[in-house]
């Protein structure tokens, strides 16, 4: 029995399903999860000592690769001064200033410890600001595991064939209206029917939790216009795409200014950190200034802030995002070319440092399109690549991530492995 198998059996005795986040369990793809022993750059090593090229990067945070020396040094510097204080620090001001500089729509920002906290708090704030209750979200967009957002939420729920989580009361779900992603007509109909009831519309401008699906400019511009017309708050959930598709996030890429933005992953540099922020007149409704309560014992944790600040400074290097986008596009185009050469129905897309792999002829534009993927073929491809030392997301419904540590050698090795994998799929 391998060390990975031994650890998984042991984990299942004390941890539900053996993992602390469902997609890690390999339930969708089958087989034994890889237990990570260490990581460096674009690679990680499992409990059996096997090395993998890593294309999940902790689900997005590791944009500069694992254990970047600048990030490591920043963390080591603050550790000697204390891990957590429950009182403000200068570093919290520094990261807030950095975020506001990089994302101009954010006039003020509040740090939290997870993307779920960020979206949950942003929705509460939008409701407090507008005095309304109804929330609009979109099929397949995952905004964390707060009850009102676990309705047709994609990602792990889609992986397990359950579009809406058990345990979400009907009285909570009734305040959430779910529309089709990229469907402008449905959006216009919803606002015509009950626009005055809508507190907020929350959207992933680049969705990464039903695989990678881009919001169309027409759709996102319609969102901006309709929310402004009806006095609803437009929330961009950029927990995944923030600082990845561009230095200023998807809102910079599309040239659209939301009212509130949720951030995470990259801003923690691999540590538990997230944030929400936006217009000053909305943020002023947060306690202690206003009546919308939000708090967190570990919010603005000094160790997480140190890792996040170091990462944010690294990604501001000239040409960083152009180089990252070029690598990611090379990977996506190369995989599509190998599949085409093997005669395997397949498509791929990339934006910034995110990519999507689809066992369909066309790149999907909606949740419904994503569900047409050939799951059995994806699962076989996943294991062929895993055996070859390439670690893609263990689900057909998750985006992938490239870091600045991925170089020509890692991309070449990935495409060589893919050539063999696609040939085996065709055989």
Swiss-Prot record:
For whether the record's keyword set contains Cytoplasm, the answer is yes
Annotated GO molecular function terms are: glutamate-1-semialdehyde 2,1-aminomutase activity; pyridoxal phosphate binding; transaminase activity
Q: In which pathway does it act?
A: Porphyrin-containing compound metabolism; protoporphyrin-IX biosynthesis; 5-aminolevulinate from L-glutamyl-tRNA(Glu): step 2/2
Quote the catalytic activity from the record. Answer: (S)-4-amino-5-oxopentanoate = 5-aminolevulinate
Tell me which residues bear N6-(pyridoxal phosphate)lysine: 265
Q: What is its EC number?
A: 5.4.3.8
GO CC terms, sorted? cytoplasm
Kindly indicate whether the keyword rRNA-binding belongs to this entry. no
Q: Which InterPro entries match?
A: 4pyrrol_synth_GluAld_NH2Trfase, Aminotrans_3, Aminotrans_3_PPA_site, PyrdxlP-dep_Trfase, PyrdxlP-dep_Trfase_major, PyrdxlP-dep_Trfase_small
Cofactor(s) it depends on = pyridoxal 5'-phosphate
Question: Which Gene3D superfamilies does the record associate with it?
Answer: Aspartate Aminotransferase, domain 1 (3.90.1150.10), Type I PLP-dependent aspartate aminotransferase-like (Major domain) (3.40.640.10)
Where it sits in the cell: the answer is: Cytoplasm
Q: How does it assemble?
A: Homodimer.
For this chain, the family text in UniProt reads: Belongs to the class-III pyridoxal-phosphate-dependent aminotransferase family. HemL subfamily.
Q: Which NCBIfam families match?
A: hemL, PRK00062.1
User: PANTHER family, from UniProt?
Assistant: GLUTAMATE-1-SEMIALDEHYDE 2,1-AMINOMUTASE (PTHR43713), GLUTAMATE-1-SEMIALDEHYDE 2,1-AMINOMUTASE 1, CHLOROPLASTIC-RELATED (PTHR43713:SF3)
Protein name per the record: Glutamate-1-semialdehyde 2,1-aminomutase
Q: Please name the source species.
A: Burkholderia mallei (strain ATCC 23344)
- Classification of source organism: Bacteria, Pseudomonadati, Pseudomonadota, Betaproteobacteria, Burkholderiales
């Amino acid at each position: 029995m391998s060390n990975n198998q031994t650890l998984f059996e042991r984990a299942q005795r004390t941890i539900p399903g053996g993992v602390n986040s469902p997609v890690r369990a390999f339930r969708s793809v089958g087989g034994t999860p890889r237990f990570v022993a260490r990581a460096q750059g674009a690679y990680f090593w499992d409990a059996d000592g096997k090395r993998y090229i890593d294309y999940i990067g902790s689900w997005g945070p590791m944009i500069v690769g694992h254990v970047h020396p600048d990030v490591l040094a920043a963390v080591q510097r603050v550790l000697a001064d204390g891990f957590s204080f429950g009182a403000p620090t200068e570093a919290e001001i520094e990261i807030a200033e950095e975020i506001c500089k990089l994302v101009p729509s954010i006039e003020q920002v509040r740090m939290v410890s997870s993307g779920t906290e960020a979206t949950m708090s942003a929705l509460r704030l939008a409701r407090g600001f507008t005095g309304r209750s109804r929330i609009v979200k979109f099929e397949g967009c995952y905004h964390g595991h707060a009850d009102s957002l676990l309705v047709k939420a994609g990602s792990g729920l889609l992986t397990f064939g359950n579009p809406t989580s058990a345990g979400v009361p009907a009285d909570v779900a009734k305040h959430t209206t779910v529309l089709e992603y990229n469907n402008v007509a449905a959006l216009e109909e919803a606002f015509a029917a009950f626009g005055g009831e809508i507190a907020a519309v929350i959207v992933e401008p680049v969705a990464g939790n039903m695989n990678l699906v881009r919001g169309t400019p027409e759709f996102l511009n319609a969102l901006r216009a309709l929310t402004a017309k009806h006095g609803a708050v437009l929330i961009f959930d950029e927990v995944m795409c923030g600082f990845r598709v561009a230095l200023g996030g998807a809102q910079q890429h599309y040239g659209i200014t939301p009212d509130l933005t949720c951030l995470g992953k990259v801003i923690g540099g691999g540590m538990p950190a997230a944030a929400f922020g936006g217009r000053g007149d909305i943020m002023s409704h947060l306690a202690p200034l206003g009546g919308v309560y939000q708090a967190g014992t570990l919010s603005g944790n000094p160790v997480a802030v140190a890792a996040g600040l170091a990462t944010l400074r690294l990604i501001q290097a000239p040409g960083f995002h152009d180089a990252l986008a070029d690598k990611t596009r090379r990977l996506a185009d190369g995989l599509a070319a190998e599949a085409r050469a093997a005669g395997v129905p397949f498509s791929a897309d990339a934006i910034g440092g995110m990519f999507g792999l689809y066992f369909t002829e066309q790149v999907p534009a909606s949740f419904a399109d994503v569900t047409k993927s050939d799951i059995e073929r994806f699962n076989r491809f996943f294991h062929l690549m895993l055996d070859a030392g390439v670690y893609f997301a263990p689900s057909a419904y998750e985006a992938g991530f490239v870091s600045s540590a991925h170089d020509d050698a890692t991309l070449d090795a990935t495409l060589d492995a893919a050539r063999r994998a696609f040939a085996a799929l065709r055989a």
